C-alpha cells in the first residue's frame, strides 16, 4: 500500500476529487494548509501599511491505496490540478506498512 499526499491550489479541489473518483479512488482526506515553495509570498497593502504574505493557502489531499492504483491516482491528480503556472503543487508518495479499519478490525488493503 502507498499513501499519496498532494498539495494543490484550493480552487482545484473539486476537479481533483472528481478525477480521483473516476480513477476508482473511494475515499480521501482533505486538510486546509498554508505554505510556500518557489511561488513565494507576495506583498499586500492594508490600511496604508505594506505587509508580506509568506504562507499561501493550499489544500492537502491524502489517500491510501493499493500499489496497483497509485499510477492512475497520480495521473488523475496531475491532470486535474495542473494550470501550468507556478504554485500548482506537489505530490508525495510514501509506503504504508499497515492499515486497520477500527469498526471491523479489517487490516491491510481490506481496511482501505
From Swiss-Prot:
InterPro entries: N-reg_PII, N-reg_PII-like_a/b, N-reg_PII/ATP_PRibTrfase_C, N-reg_PII_CS, N-reg_PII_urydylation_site. Keywords: Nitrogen fixation, Nucleotide-binding, Phosphoprotein, Transcription, Transcription regulation. It holds the Pfam family P-II. It comes from the Bacteria. One of its GO terms (cellular component) is cytosol. GO terms for molecular function: ATP binding; enzyme regulator activity. GO terms for biological process: nitrogen fixation; regulation of nitrogen utilization. The modification O-UMP-tyrosine is found at residue 51. P-II indirectly controls the transcription of the glutamine synthetase gene (glnA). P-II prevents NR-II-catalyzed conversion of NR-I to NR-I-phosphate, the transcriptional activator of glnA. When P-II is uridylylated to P-II-UMP, these events are reversed. When the ratio of Gln to 2-ketoglutarate decreases, P-II is uridylylated to P-II-UMP, which causes the deadenylation of glutamine synthetase, so activating the enzyme. Homotrimer. Belongs to the P(II) protein family. This is Nitrogen regulatory protein P-II. It comes from Cereibacter sphaeroides.
